[in-house]
């Protein structure tokens, strides 16, 4: 059984027991989170596709950790001008473990 849900402007395909990195959520570590915007649920041959969301669909997860991703380097370089600009960015994320899928 797996589900596709939306969080942080992105869609994630998950199954129970899976650990997923999402955009940062303002929830403490160890707390439960419920995602109501379930777009699709598949249980064997039974496929439920939402228009746009599945009625009564819910993905329940537990927050495992918060952190920051790998550094992305942004470089702006102008040739022949002796000009260079560097910048870095590390995006915050929340790691959750999927504990239940309901349809």
From Swiss-Prot:
Q: Name one GO molecular function term.
A: rRNA binding
Asked whether the UniProt record includes Membrane among its keywords, one would answer no
The processes (GO biological process) annotated in the record are: translation
Recite the UniProt keywords alphabetically.
Ribonucleoprotein, Ribosomal protein, RNA-binding, rRNA-binding
State the Pfam families in the record: Ribosomal_L21p
- Keyword Ribonucleoprotein among UniProt keywords: yes
Q: Name one GO cellular component term.
A: ribonucleoprotein complex
- InterPro entries assigned: bL21-like, bL21-like_sf, Ribosomal_bL21, Ribosomal_bL21_CS
Q: What does this protein do?
A: This protein binds to 23S rRNA in the presence of protein L20.
Q: Which NCBIfam families match?
A: L21 (TIGR00061)
Subunit text: Part of the 50S ribosomal subunit. Contacts protein L20.
Which PANTHER family would you find in this protein's record?
Answer: 50S RIBOSOMAL PROTEIN L21, LARGE RIBOSOMAL SUBUNIT PROTEIN BL21M
Sequence similarity: Belongs to the bacterial ribosomal protein bL21 family.
Q: In its UniProt entry, what is this protein called? A: Large ribosomal subunit protein bL21
Encoding gene (name): rplU
């Amino acid at each position: 059984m797996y589900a596709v849900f939306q969080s942080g402007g992105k869609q994630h395909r998950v199954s129970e027991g899976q650990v997923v990195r999402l955009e940062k959520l303002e929830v403490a570590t160890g707390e439960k989170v419920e995602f109501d915007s379930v777009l699709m649920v598949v249980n064997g041959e039974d496929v439920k596709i939402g228009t746009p969301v599945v009625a009564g669909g819910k993905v329940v997860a537990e927050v495992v950790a918060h952190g920051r991703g790998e550094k992305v380097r942004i470089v702006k370089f102008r040739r022949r001008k002796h000009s260079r600009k560097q910048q870095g960015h590390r995006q915050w994320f929340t790691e959750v473990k999927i504990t239940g899928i309901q349809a």
